[in-house]
Amino acid sequence: PILEKTRQEYLMYLLKLCTGLSLLMSAYNDVIFAPHLMAENGLGNIFLLVEVVIGILLILNFHIFAATILLFLLCIGVAFTFGALVALEYLNMTGIACCLLLFNFHPEKYRVHLKAYSISSLRILTGIALVSLGLSEKLLNPDLGEFFVAQYQWNFMLNLGFTDFSNELFVFCAGMMEVNFGIILIIGTTTRVNILVVSAFMFTSNITFFASGNYSEALLEIFGHLPFIATAMILIFFGS
């Protein structure tokens, strides 16, 4: 039991560390969560400051309750500033806040019962984020995805010899896969296998950026994926 508890604590700290690093990198680049969510005017600067504070608290493993509350508020701020759809796309950050809050709940006598809900909230909200990303950036708005694929030569199927695999087909398949993976996460079946496959595709995207020589974009992609990488490790360890 002691070893099991230690492993759980290490995994939770990994989630804090990865999320904190991702937030600090976002703040350094003057964005909120992702490159297309630019921080503008005074409110944007407040968001950046909140990102920095949350990132430092999570990395130092200090005042986690305050950090999770600030992360909740930041997610709400994103929803009001950029719209509900964008908030859904990054609902995994809300899931991380829920997970850390429930896993470190006080008083401690309630913590044992809430730990199970912490993992479920992380899994379900991450699943909703994947479904939202698949729909908004690919299936419902394929032009955006096709522009991205063409600009960064991201269609790795062509590099594998599938010459008839067009950018349009690539974007459609990527969107369908994200939606399906997200639904499976929400349902909670074959969680470990599902999250491993999603992680493999994210790893492929990072390799593709490096292979195409877009090193700065690759670095941003890695830091942006850090919260998901930690989430994947937690779901692999805990399951559904």
Question: How would you name each of these model-derived features?
Answer:
Residues 1-147, 162-176, 187-240:
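Extended, low-polarity transmembrane helix blocks
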Residues 153-162:
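Juxtamembrane membrane-water interface segments that cap and precede transmembrane helices
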Residues 182:
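Conformational-control "hinges and anchors"
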